[in-house]
């Protein structure tokens, strides 16, 4: 592997498999049992106008990347550093070949991203959401728990938990009817527990806080 610690330390956990052509740039923390495939780039600076490494021309340092235990990052995946919060890939996530995780995006546990899916900056994805191949999200989007996004969809607004959406722009098609979701095909907010909506509300609160900080940084 190629390691760049110019702007921060690279920490690799136990029992990881990292191909020699992968590029790891700090600040970066990788948990245990993580797979990083050929030509993956993890920790590159944010794609945003401004100075390296922060990307907004401010004195604030990059917030880095956290890859949690058991994540699988396939060949040619890109994961960029956060600017105001760490970019996070959660436990047991599967990022298929060519997926792009933009700066400040955060993925919960068990998220699946199809090949060549692209997240806009600051995207938040809750646990066990699934992206088909070629999905694109608008910056600042929130994807709820166990949501299903159909292939080649363009997601321009938040997706509620357990929803199934597809299209360009993506539209609600019903519930995620996969066996592990255990919902009827017709989507209704009343089907979901209070705890699911509480999780979704916490994501929204986190996003509003980040938007306030971002506005301050961008005009300071």
What does each of the following model-derived ranges do?
Residues 1-172:
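Structural signal for interior beta-strand "rungs" in well-ordered beta-sheet cores
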Residues 168, 176-187:
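Amphipathic alpha-helical blocks and their helix-capping loop/short-beta junctions
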